[in-house]
């Protein structure tokens, strides 16, 4: 049984889930918040910081040594300062929210003359390294005043990967295998086979070289290479004839010998027969050590070593030569006793490296290095040093090459090593063994005999030989998540490396000129790199702020695109497809439709990343068929070894699996296993899906395509005026609302002492007060009518009343689209599935007028309009109400400064901010000259460039902000705004101080009442303080009391100190705020003044608006019908929405039907509760009825509601909140069954079929058959007809073609395109067509003439030459073809 919090007791969802919750839904923004916290390590003691984030980046670049080595700059530590502006101020002023980064560095200068590098002097100093953006507590960044989200990236993990070309390269369809070593940063190293089975290597995808060149450059000789990759057969040469083979029976398998193979007289294999496994067993049993074979058995085999005549030193044959008859005789003649040959065959021991050596032109290490140099730097003359340095820098220096911890772990696992740690560079025993520097010696000592490059080639040749498998690059064990912190670290490191180059050059000057660290380091490159990343990286996105769900989903998004990722064009089908390893890690449903499908995914509900960045998902442990509550997180790699049962596998009361065979997953396959073989079990049925998909009730009854649309469209729902909780939900709504950050949650428990629309004050309970200075008062300021990124309205409303007792985490105020702390994206509408006069053809939606009347889908949109006054060449622009040629009426909404009043209702075309721009002297017409002579100069030297309301928009002005550049006098309106803002802040601080003070005095009263005094404040020694005495005493005189009790004296002293401390603190904060408000603003260059006007636009639902349910059932409103014409039930209740029943069967989203049935039951139960309340039934009866609703089903122990926890008062409050309908939760994949839905309908006294008789509102006649009726949570999406409808009469024209511009934003026209022209041609409408192509488009003279004609009342047109024809002529002339028009 759960105990309920204050908020949860207000309204409880009936939960149909059968599984009890093992794991609470985790904090949904953890992937963002934790990642960035690890990057900053802000509140970590500098000595204890781990190798992550800023600390790691600074450590990797420093120390920086000068070229001579006589000066070095070392890193000591860093700290982050306080941000100058808080989040709200940054949003308002268009600033970035960040803190200054100060790094402590130490400059060490060594004595040149000394041989032991003695230190000459040391200087330590703090250096400013730019601003580091800070993350808000909701996981966003504020960049230039807008909220942005850095989306996590799913990229290929560093490490080594083996693959083949799927037979596409060569016409024969032969599989060509390849390997690729991918570092975290540095050059890629590829190995690949060609069709002739030679092995090649490529560096950074350049020209390929035989792999032996790379090995030779590492220092291996031919003999060493062959010894590494082949086993060797030894032949002893008889002096006269024949050869003895040292026999390893296994190596003969599959061969056909040209002679009998015998053990003494017993023939084991006859000549010409193939040797099988049985023969080999007989050979092993016989114990034959050597086998006499004829000469032709050894001829044609490949030598493993050079063969030298011992007496003369003459080279008889080289390693990798095929032995010829002549050479064999030469060996005999020179008395060579034994030779080694490579054991190769065509089956599973291919001669790949041997083939490669034959095409390798190089002989020495230097030649190989030069060859690599030529390939990397074609056209540059190679020198020995240059070639060696280039090769070393490619893979063997940490500055240029970094496998990273992940890469090393993946590399070692793939080549079959035990340890998961190692060097970040590639290690090779031969290469480092031949070098003498300290670092090389350290590496050799640490890693001894291993070799990374050789190991990769060995695994690759094994795969080519048929042993081993290639990797699946779409497996989530080979793709990892790069989150904000890691990306920021990489960008920061890039900036530091740029700084490093500059510092190196200046350090040589520092030796001689005594520069300080501050003069050495220029922070600009670091700041620029960070600014560029947060401002314009592909993964830094404008936050989707339509509603709380869209915010949460955006932060949990995982993208395969972006820098270092895929591109849409190159991504094939495999990458986009659902992979078995997505289960529980990435949502298999939610992904965009369109070109990004499958490339952008959402994290599953319980998924998290591990230390390496791989996604993990939780499972419950199962031992011998018993399921435990212990939870373990497994990554895709670890999961491969286990058998995993589903969350809804049947268990008995003791949590033992009861089925004989349990449905399981194992290595990506679904199969049945006995309980004893099961290792783990899912924690929850919704483990596979993301937050958005987990919000769709009855998801298990919807087709996946429609579920995808449903999940995506919930993110587009616009918050309505009054949010309404979904009657049928899934139980996860509360978690989404809580973590989205739109609600206000209590930081600490306590009592509500003061409340208004904009502020809630909580007196904290004693247990949660920390430290002596803590006054025990929490003040929550609410967000009122603010604009979101998508222009929707963000507003918070208090939910609590004075005197309420709350606990930590309780919801104090609702935000947009939340209802008592639950996500509420739409409205519960009464829906009927039936055709109605063709108005719901093709998914159209028929609405009742009542929906519009009751403002059910009325939404508020806040538009921000900006007017900027610049300094122009002809003089400054001016914001004023004195505008030429504008009527008084047009100016009646402006104040004397030329800015619109707050509260003014404006329509399209109205002036909001008056602005005039100086215009150049032009040639005056005689009329203008006359006017000038009469009225003086002023009238014409400025033109009107006021800010007007854009077409198609009307609303109410709710806020105006005026920004003035520093050093320019503020106008009256700006000063007014400033004064009112200072007043507001002052009042805020005064209120806060008063509340704190009252709380302190109250606490003090409880500590001194009833205590004895020694005197003071008019009391005698031995008097006892009473409540009445304190009430009559002035507050300031309390501190004059001298107490007998030591503790009471301390309490008085402490209270006095607290009040003084708070007073000082508030004064400081107020002065700080005041300074910020009165200071001039930092505006863009050339801008003198900027006015922002915020318009609240009310949008009622109307035909053309898009609406949708949660099951992908979307449509467009076709008509709004009077209430009296809508179908109605026998009770006289009319339906709100009529949907087309034909939209259901073909789309296979049956979830909507079940939702409608259950929603009807929920509403019916609410009505029954309301009837009981109105009849003033006994509380006991009410309790029994509620118990019947929540706890009827005895089998469902998991989700019983313990009503005994509720007092009668709480029960009545609960019942009042249920009268609008009893909310139900039907969790994904664990939802209500048909029987349960029927039971709920019966309990609500509704037909269990879910259908009822409807009557036609126009005629009153009953319809022929019963209709499915019920309540569905229906959303209005942010695709409103008001934003899309657009018409143009005259407007702007394109400069070159003189044709009207296109698009609503440019106030453009509709293109009369190619096909439309064909249509007019087909009808022979020649004059209409001529008009379309000339005067209505780009015949400049023609359209001017036509305007004059219309003004003069003549209705005729003269079509001239379209401007685009002139453009065409000019184009042709630019190709040097003259084309002239003749008058005809």
Curated annotation (Swiss-Prot):
It holds the Pfam family RNA_pol_Rpb2_7. Keywords: DNA-directed RNA polymerase, Nucleotidyltransferase, Transcription, Transferase. GO terms for cellular component: DNA-directed RNA polymerase complex. Signal peptide: none annotated. InterPro entries: DNA-dir_RNA_pol_bsu_external_1, DNA-dir_RNA_pol_su2, DNA-dir_RNAP_su2_dom, DNA-dir_RNAP_su2_hyb_sf, RNA_pol_bsu_bac, RNA_pol_bsu_CS, RNA_pol_bsu_protrusion, RNA_pol_Rpb2_2. One of its GO terms (biological process) is DNA-templated transcription. It is an enzyme of class 2 (transferase). It catalyses: RNA(n) + a ribonucleoside 5'-triphosphate = RNA(n+1) + diphosphate. Its EC number is 2.7.7.6. GO terms for molecular function: DNA binding; DNA-directed RNA polymerase activity; ribonucleoside binding. Belongs to the RNA polymerase beta chain family. NCBIfam families: PRK00405.1 (NF001616), rpoB (TIGR02013). DNA-dependent RNA polymerase catalyzes the transcription of DNA into RNA using the four ribonucleoside triphosphates as substrates. PANTHER family: DNA-DIRECTED RNA POLYMERASE I SUBUNIT 2. The RNAP catalytic core consists of 2 alpha, 1 beta, 1 beta' and 1 omega subunit. When a sigma factor is associated with the core the holoenzyme is formed, which can initiate transcription. This is DNA-directed RNA polymerase subunit beta.
């Amino acid at each position: 049984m759960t105990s309920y919090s204050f908020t949860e007791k207000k309204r409880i969802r009936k939960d149909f889930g059968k599984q009890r919750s093992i794991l609470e839904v985790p904090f949904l923004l953890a992937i963002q918040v934790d990642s960035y916290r690890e990057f900053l390590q802000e509140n970590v003691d500098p000595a204890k910081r781990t190798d992550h984030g800023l600390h790691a980046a600074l450590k990797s670049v420093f120390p920086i040594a000068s070229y001579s080595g006589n000066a070095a700059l070392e890193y000591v530590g860093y700290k982050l300062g306080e941000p100058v502006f808080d989040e709200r101020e940054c949003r308002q002023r268009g600033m970035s929210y960040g803190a200054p980064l100060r790094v402590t560095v130490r400059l060490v200068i060594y004595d040149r003359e000394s041989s032991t590098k003695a230190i000459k002097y040391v200087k330590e100093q703090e250096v400013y390294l730019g601003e580091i953006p800070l993350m808000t507590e909701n996981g966003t960044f504020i960049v230039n005043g807008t909220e942005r989200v850095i989306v996590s990236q799913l990229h290929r993990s560093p490490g080594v990967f083996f693959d083949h070309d799927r037979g596409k390269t060569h016409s024969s369809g032969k599989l060509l295998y390849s390997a690729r070593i991918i570092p975290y940063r540095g050059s890629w190293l590829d190995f690949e086979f060609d069709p002739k089975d030679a092995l090649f290597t490529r560096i950074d995808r350049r020209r390929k070289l035989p792999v032996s060149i790379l090995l030779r450059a590492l220092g291996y000789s031919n003999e060493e290479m062959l010894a590494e990759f082949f086993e060797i057969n030894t032949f002893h040469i008889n002096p006269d004839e024949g050869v003895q083979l040292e026999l390893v029976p296994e190596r003969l398998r599959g061969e056909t010998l040209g002679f009998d193979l015998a053990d003494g007289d017993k023939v084991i294999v006859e000549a010409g027969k193939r040797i099988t496994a049985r023969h080999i067993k007989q050979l092993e049993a016989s114990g034959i050590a050597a086998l006499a074979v004829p000469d032709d058995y050894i001829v044609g085999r490949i030598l493993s070593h050079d063969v030298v005549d011992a007496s003369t030193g003459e080279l008889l044959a080289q390693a990798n030569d095929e032995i010829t008859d002549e050479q064999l005789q030469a060996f005999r003649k020179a008395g060579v006793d034994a030779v080694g040959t490579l054991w190769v065959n065509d089956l599973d021991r291919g001669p790949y490296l041997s083939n490669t050596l034959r095409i390798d032109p190089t002989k020495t290490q230097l030649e190989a290095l030069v060859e690599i140099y030529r390939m990397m730097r074609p056209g540059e003359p190679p020198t020995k040093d240059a070639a060696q340095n280039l090769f070393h820098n490619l893979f063997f220096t940490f500055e240029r090459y970094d496998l990273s911890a992940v890469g090393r772990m993946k590399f070692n696992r793939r080549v079959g090593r035990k340890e998961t740690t190692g060097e970040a560079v590639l290690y090779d025993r031969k290469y480092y063994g031949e070098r003498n520097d300290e670092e090389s010696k350290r590496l050799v000592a640490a890693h001894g005999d291993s070799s990374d490059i050789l190991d990769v080639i060995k695994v690759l040749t094994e795969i080519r030989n048929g042993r081993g498998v290639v990797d699946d690059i779409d497996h989530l064990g080979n793709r990892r998540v790069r989150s904000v912190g890691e990306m920021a670290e990489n960008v920061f490191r890039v900036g530091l490396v740029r700084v490093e180059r500059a510092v190196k050059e200046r350090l040589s000057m520092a030796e001689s000129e005594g520069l300080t660290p501050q003069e050495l380091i220029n922070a600009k490159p670091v700041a620029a790199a960070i600014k560029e990343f947060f401002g314009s990286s592909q993964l830094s996105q404008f936050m989707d702020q339509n509603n709380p769900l869209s915010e949460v989903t955006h932060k949990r998004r995982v993208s395969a695109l972006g820098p270092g990722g895929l591109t849409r064009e190159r991504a094939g089908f495999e990458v986009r497809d659902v992979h078995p390893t997505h289960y529980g890690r990435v949502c298999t449903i939610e992904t965009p439709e369109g070109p990004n499908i499958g490339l952008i995914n959402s994290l599953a509900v319980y998924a998290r990343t591990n230390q390496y960045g791989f996604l993990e998902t939780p499972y419950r442990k199962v031992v011998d068929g018993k399921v435990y509550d212990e939870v373990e997180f497994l990554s895709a790699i670890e999961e491969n070894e286990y058998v995993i049962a589903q969350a809804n596998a049947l268990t008995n009361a003791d949590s033992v699996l009861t089925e004989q065979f349990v449905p399981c997953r194992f290595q990506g396959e679904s199969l049945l296993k006995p309980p004893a073989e099961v290792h783990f079990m899912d924690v929850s049925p919704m483990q596979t899906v993301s937050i958005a998909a987990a919000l769709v009730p009855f998801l298990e009854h919807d087709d996946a395509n429609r579920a995808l649309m449903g999940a995506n469209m919930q993110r587009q729902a616009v918050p309505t005026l009054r949010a309404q909780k979904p009657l049928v939900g899934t139980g996860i709504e509360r978690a989404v609302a809580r973590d989205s950050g739109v609600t206000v949650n209590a930081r600490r428990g306590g009592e509500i002492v003061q409340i208004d629309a904009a502020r809630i004050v909580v007196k904290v309970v004693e247990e949660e007060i920390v430290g002596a200075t803590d006054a025990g008062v929490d003040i929550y300021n609410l967000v009122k009518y603010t604009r979101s990124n998508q222009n929707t309205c963000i507003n918070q409303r208090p939910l609590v009343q004075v005197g309420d007792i709350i606990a930590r985490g309780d919801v104090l105020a609702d935000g947009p689209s939340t209802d008592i702390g639950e996500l509420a994206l739409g409205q519960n509408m009464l829906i009927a599935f039936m055709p109605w006069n063709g108005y719901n053809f093709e998914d159209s939606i028929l609405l009742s007028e009542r929906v519009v009347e009751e403002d059910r889908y009325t939404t508020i949109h806040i538009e921000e309009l900006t007017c900027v006054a610049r300094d122009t060449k002809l003089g400054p622009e001016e914001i004023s109400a004195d505008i030429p040629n504008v009527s008084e009426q047009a100016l009646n909404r402006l104040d004397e400064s030329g800015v619109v009043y707050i509260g003014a209702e404006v329509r399209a075309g109205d002036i909001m901010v008056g602005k005039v721009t100086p215009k150049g002297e032009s040639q005056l017409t005689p009329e203008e000259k006359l006017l000038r002579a009469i009225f003086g100069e002023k009238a014409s030297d400025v033109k009107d460039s006021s800010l007007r309301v854009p077409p198609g928009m009307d609303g109410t002005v709710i806020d105006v902000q005026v920004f003035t550049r520093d050093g320019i006098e503020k106008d009256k309106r700006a000063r007014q705004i400033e004064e009112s803002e200072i007043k507001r802040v002052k009042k805020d601080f005064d209120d806060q101080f008063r509340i704190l003070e009252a709380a302190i005095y109250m606490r003090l009263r409880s500590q001194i009442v009833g205590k004895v005094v020694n005197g003071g404040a008019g009391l005698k020694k031995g008097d006892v303080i009473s409540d009445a005495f304190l009430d009559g005493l002035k507050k300031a005189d309390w501190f004059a009391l001298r107490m007998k009790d030591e503790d009471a004296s301390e309490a008085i002293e402490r209270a006095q100190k607290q009040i003084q401390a708070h007073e000082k603190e508030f004064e400081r904060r107020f002065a700080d705020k005041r300074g910020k408000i009165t200071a001039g603003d930092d505006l863009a260059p050339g801008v003198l003044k900027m006015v922002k006007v915020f318009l609240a636009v009310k949008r009622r639902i109307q035909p053309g608006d898009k609406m949708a349910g949660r099951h992908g059932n979307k449509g467009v409103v076709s008509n709004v019908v009077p209430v009296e014409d809508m179908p109605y039930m026998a009770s006289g209740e009319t339906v709100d929405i009529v949907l087309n029943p034909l939209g259901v069967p073909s789309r296979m989203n049956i979830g909507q039907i079940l939702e409608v049935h259950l929603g009807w039951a929920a509403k019916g139960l609410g009505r029954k509760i309301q009837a009981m309340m109105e009849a003033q039934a006994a509380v006991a009866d009410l309790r029994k009825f509620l118990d019947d609703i929540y706890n009827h089903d005895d089998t469902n122990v998991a989700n019983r509601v313990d009503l005994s926890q509720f007092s009668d008062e709480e029960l009545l409050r609960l019942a009042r909140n249920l009268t609008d309908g009893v909310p139900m939760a039907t969790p994904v994949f664990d939802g209500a069954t048909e029987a349960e839905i029927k039971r709920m309908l019966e309990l609500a006294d509704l037909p269990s079929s879910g259908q009822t008789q409807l009557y036609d509102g126009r005629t009153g006649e009953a319809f022929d058959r019963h209709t499915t009726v019920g309540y569905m949570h229906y959303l209005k999406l942010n695709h409103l007809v008001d934003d899309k409808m657009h018409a143009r009469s005259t407007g702007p024209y394109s400069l070159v073609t003189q044709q009207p511009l296109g698009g609503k934003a440019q106030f453009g026209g509709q293109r009369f395109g190619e096909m439309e022209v064909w249509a007019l041609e087909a009808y022979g409408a020649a004059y209409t067509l001529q008009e379309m192509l000339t005067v209505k488009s780009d015949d400049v003279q023609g359209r001017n003439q036509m305007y004059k004609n219309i003004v003069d009342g003549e209705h005729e047109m003269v079509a001239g030459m379209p401007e685009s024809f002139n453009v065409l002529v000019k184009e042709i002339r630019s190709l040097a073809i003259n084309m002239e028009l003749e008058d005809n």
